[in-house]
Amino acid sequence: MPRFLYLCLGLLLVRVSRELNDISRARRLCGQHLLHEIVKLCGDVNWSHVEKEKPFTQLLSQASEKVESFIPDRSESSQTTFPVWRRATNPVPTSASQEEAINNMKMQSLPEYQYKKANLPFKTRQEESSSSQDISPYIHEIIEFQKKNTNKIKTLSNLFWGNHPQRKRRGYSEKCCQKGCTKEELIIACLPYIDYENLRKHQQL
């Protein structure tokens, strides 16, 4: 009987040590593999529930697009056995060109909108203004939530990357893809999701 007990205790210790090694061991994760690992660490997601909620699905798809900023190349480097990673070839528009495009769209759509608004009956215009006032508090709440998350992510970024500017430029996904991330480092990505869940629960009460 004592021998069986020692055997069980030994197996338990081996399992615990393996789990501890797994937490501290850095794994190289890229693209969908990185996103799936983060989702798994943040908690089991009820996908049938997520499909009904458009905003959260869009958040996941946006996160997926950001994570997949590196595309694997089939060729391999002569110095290493790992695949060579290159940046996506699609050019990203600059902020100046984006601003110019938005201004052009505003200039084109504004006269037409004003003309339609001027021809609306007085009652309809009152309803439109009252509906926009009803939406304003909700928009303000979303903006405050985004500011809070941005500040938190900046603080965590400094803790995670330190004061090294080159590391900050490389970014989270590139570091996990090229050098590897531990589970402790990946858990940092769960904090915005936890805040989102808490906000949803608060709104439901």
UniProtKB/Swiss-Prot annotation:
Secretion signal, residue range per the UniProt entry: 1-19
SUPFAM superfamilies: Insulin-like (SSF56994)
GO cellular component terms given for this protein: extracellular space
Single GO MF descriptor: hormone activity
Main location: secreted
Pfam families: Insulin
Family affiliation: Belongs to the insulin family.
Protein's name in the database: Insulin-like peptide INSL6
The encoding gene: INSL6
